Amino acid sequence: MRVPRPQPWALGLLLFLLPGSLGAESHLSLLYHLTAVSSPAPGTPAFWVSGWLGPQQYLSYDSLRGQAEPCGAWVWENQVSWYWEKETTDLRIKEKLFLEAFKALGGKGPYTLQGLLGCELSPDNTSVPTAKFALNGEEFMNFDLKQGTWGGDWPEALAISQRWQQQDKAANKELTFLLFSCPHRLREHLERGRGNLEWKEPPSMRLKARPGNPGFSVLTCSAFSFYPPELQLRFLRNGMAAGTGQGDFGPNSDGSFHASSSLTVKSGDEHHYCCIVQHAGLAQPLRVELETPAKSSVLVVGIVIGVLLLTAAAVGGALLWRRMRSGLPAPWISLRGDDTGSLLPTPGEAQDADSKDINVIPATA
C-alpha cells in the first residue's frame, strides 16, 4: 500500500529537516518524522511515521497497519525480541496525540500536522534532543526541555499544548523519550547494526525513449532500488556532455531510493545519446545505452512463451488427473513395453501364464 505524502504546501518541514542527515554519512542521529492529516483520502492512513538512523530509513508505521516495521538492511538487525513491540506501543501513543490535536484546532481544516522527534550524538558522545512541529508546512511549536512542555507563539500551539497536557503523563513521556530513551536506542542500534550504515546497493538502470512534442522525443534515464541516496545522472551525446535533464527522486518502502532524469532531444537523434550514472555502490561510472525496441520485443516474446508453457502444463496436468481417476494408467506407464503386463495390464487384455495366481488348485478330472 502506498503511504500518502503531505500536501505540497505542507512539505516545508520535511524538506528543511531531512537533507542534512541524508547527505552526511557520519551523522549519528535517530529521528522520527511523524505526519497526520485531518481529512485522509479513503483507504489511506490518517497518521504515519518514518524513522531514520543517520541517512537510512529504518522504521515505518501507519495507522492502517498499526505496527512498527523495520526497513532496508535493518530488517536483519539482531534486535531484542520486544524491541518492535515497544516501538509500536510508543507510536500508537503518538498517533493518539496527533489526532487529538485536530480536535483542539476545531473543524476549519484541512490540516497537516508534522513532527520531528529524536536525538543526535555530538562528537563528545553527548546527546542533543530535537522536538519540532509544523502545521500546514510552517514550524509553529517545539518542546521546551526546561519547562517540560510544548510551546509556541501561535494560538494553535497553545490550543494543542493544552490538549496534550490533558493526556496522562504525556509531557513527562516526551521528556523521558528525548533525554533518555532516544539516546539509548541510538547507541543500541549503533552497537548492533553499525554495519548497516555502510550498506551499499547499486542501482538497476534503464534508458528509454518516448514521443514528445512534434519533432521531439523524451529520453528518460531511470535508477531503481539503490542506496545510499547520493546518485548522479547525466547525459552524453556522442561522448560529449549533454546536461542532466529534469530529475525526480524519492524513497522506496524498503529503505532504498529511486531516481530518474529526462531530456528532450530531436526525433531520430535518440541513439546518439547515453546515460552515465555514478553511485557509491558502483566500482566505476556506469554507461547506460538506449533500450532498443528489439530488446523490448524479446522480453515480450519471452513472457508470452512462458505463459503458453504454463498453460500447457496446467492442461496436461488436468488431463492426467482425469485419466488416472478413471482407472487408466498414466501415458508413460502404457509405453513401457514388457513391463506393461506385470505393472498395470491394459484393460480387457488377458494376463500371461507367468502372471497367474500360483496358489490356485487345479480342477480334478
UniProtKB/Swiss-Prot annotation:
Segments passing through the bilayer: 298-321
InterPro entries associated with the record: Ig-like_dom, Ig-like_dom_sf, Ig-like_fold, Ig/MHC_CS, Ig_C1-set, MHC_class-I_related, MHC_I-like_Ag-recog, MHC_I-like_Ag-recog_sf
One GO biological process term: immune response
Glycosylation sites noted in the Swiss-Prot or TrEMBL record: 125
Chain segments carrying region Connecting peptide: 291-297
Positions of disulphide bridges: 119-182, 221-275
UniProt membrane topology term: Single-pass type I membrane protein
GO cellular component, one term: external side of plasma membrane
UniProt-annotated stretches for the region Alpha-1: 24-110
Signal peptide: 1-23
Region Alpha-3, residue ranges: 201-290
Cytoplasmic side: 322-365
Residue numbers on the Extracellular membrane side: 24-297
SMART domains listed in its UniProt record: IGc1 (SM00407)
Swiss-Prot/TrEMBL keywords: Cell membrane, Disulfide bond, Endosome, Glycoprotein, IgG-binding protein, Immunoglobulin domain, Membrane, Phosphoprotein, Receptor, Signal, Transmembrane, Transmembrane helix
One GO MF term attached to the UniProt entry: beta-2-microglobulin binding
Subcellular location: Cell membrane; Endosome membrane
Protein role: Cell surface receptor that transfers passive humoral immunity from the mother to the newborn. Binds to the Fc region of monomeric immunoglobulin gamma and mediates its selective uptake from milk. IgG in the milk is bound at the apical surface of the intestinal epithelium. The resultant FcRn-IgG complexes are transcytosed across the intestinal epithelium and IgG is released from FcRn into blood or tissue fluids. Throughout life, contributes to effective humoral immunity by recycling IgG and extending its half-life in the circulation.
Homology family: Belongs to the immunoglobulin superfamily.
Protein name: IgG receptor FcRn large subunit p51
Organism: Macaca fascicularis (Crab-eating macaque)
Gene: FCGRT
